[in-house]
Amino acid sequence: MCRFKSGIIFKSRCVVAPGENDSHSDLLREMNIEDTYTNASRLFVRAELVPKNNEWWTDPDGWEFVVDQDVTPDWYDTDPGKYEEEFRQAVKAWWDKHVIVDKKIDELSSGFYRLKRCKVKKLLNDVKVYLDRSTVGEMCGRSTVGEMWGSSTVGKMRDSSTVGKMWGRSTVGKMWDSSTVGEMWGSSTVGEMWGSSTVGKMRNSSTARDFKNYPNVKIHIPKGGKFELVEHEEEKPCD
């Protein structure tokens, strides 16, 4: 199983898997290299730099180096330490560009990013992000949140913006136009759905409120789930 962060070591260079796909096989296919035993023994080394406890926001200098194949080329075996260091530097360069921690950002409009404890005002165009305890004010265009973890929030989704998976206590405030949420897990919530917005699969105790026929409001819950409607009682003012 390929793990974050994967790449391929060649005799003269290292290639780190772009974006969120850490499959060695897919990366080799993109480079038109057959993923065979013979090629693994001559041309390349499948490698990974793996953060402890999957804490991808920590400094890669402390991550574990892993060779993900049984056979390695002779050129690698003559100086494995050299190639490990070259791969570490390549992953560190990728991490510096694509992992953002504890930042306030006006907008992201292209590329792929993993965000930890960040606040972003807008996601635009075809940017794709993964959120962990991060906040996005508004998503527009074809912007995508691959996954939301922890208490991550998205305020508004517009146009054809997409959230792949919501976990934990993650929240989407309002969905408009043709925006979509693929899967909801844990106690994740969608506050309001408008227009032709959609939610694909719902699991656990996730909920979504459908305002498309307002003032008639539908509450979506997972199939087989239980939902209790309780009338809110306002506190009486003190005399």
Map each language-model feature to its residues.
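Short, glycine-biased loop/turn motifs at secondary-structure junctions and
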Residues: M1-D239
